[in-house]
Amino acid sequence: MELSPSVVREHDRAAPDPSETGTATFGLGCFWGPDARFGALEGVVRTRVGYAGGTRTDPSYHALGDHTEVVQVDFDPERTSYRALAGRALDAHDPNRQVRTTQYQNVVFAVTAAQRETLAAVLEERGLQADAIETRIERLDRFYPAEDYHQKHSLRGTPGLQPVFDELGYDDVELRESPAAAKLNGAAGGYDVGGDLGAGLDLAAGPR
């Protein structure tokens, strides 16, 4: 099956509406890798990268202030959960170690009381406590999307993928928020995504 604009369009049309999804936000070093890793996961609908956790208003990559690079994940609660995603975030690094540079620190954000309770349970399952680990456990006050060139970085760097979205007339925001782009970015990052999109992608050469 070839990856074609029609496949991308139908995948996006069939995806859950943003109002039907939950959201999780994590800092796990440079946000390019986590964007691909989480985008490939079952139940993840959309991803975007950005900045959070600091006090500077309207940060940018070159004026980051005390913010951290993060990936924000929208997920279908009927197919995955905040618990599962937070567990993956914790398992992706050593919670007992932290890098010095705030930009690349490990942080797990919890927005609601339910997420905070869930996160405490996930930590307990691993024999961890929020106040005894190096990973930052914080409430999310505000998320600032990163510049367009940081969004779907693996997809943008894989020959033949972005032109599919260009042919559909997607602008940068639509590419960032595209469920198909999240999956294809994961595939371009080396992860198995399966389904209609994965069937049409040759990781070595882009779309067949």
List each model region and its residues.
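Flexible coil/turn and secondary-structure edge motifs
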Residues: M1-R208
